[in-house]
């Protein structure tokens, strides 16, 4: 379960780099939205993974 949390965290970091790097206005907005979505998913899976132990 923590493996999924790590995967979501890496995806969130990639989305942040693309979103906050100033690549394109449309892509940046999409990346910012994805960043927050994946951060929430990361936190949920992290909590669930810790709760299972």
From Swiss-Prot:
Annotated compartments: Cell membrane
Taxonomy of the source species: Bacteria, Pseudomonadati, Pseudomonadota, Betaproteobacteria, Burkholderiales
Membrane topology: Multi-pass membrane protein
NCBIfam families the UniProt entry points to: PRK13682.1-1, PRK13682.1-4
Annotated GO CC locations: plasma membrane
Transmembrane helix found in the keyword field: yes
HAMAP family, A to Z: UPF0391
Protein's UniProt name: UPF0391 membrane protein BPSS2216
InterPro entries per record: DUF1328
Transmembrane segments: 5-25, 30-50
Chief location: membrane
Protein family membership: Belongs to the UPF0391 family.
Organism expressing this protein natively: Burkholderia pseudomallei (strain K96243)
Keyword Transmembrane included in the entry's annotation: yes
Assigned keywords, A-Z: Cell membrane, Membrane, Transmembrane, Transmembrane helix
């Amino acid at each position: 379960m923590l493996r999924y949390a790590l995967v979501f965290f890496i995806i969130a970091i990639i989305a942040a780099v693309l979103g906050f790097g100033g690549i394109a206005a449309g892509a940046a907005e999409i990346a910012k939205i994805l960043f927050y979505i994946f951060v929430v998913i990361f936190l949920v899976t992290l909590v669930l993974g810790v709760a299972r132990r």
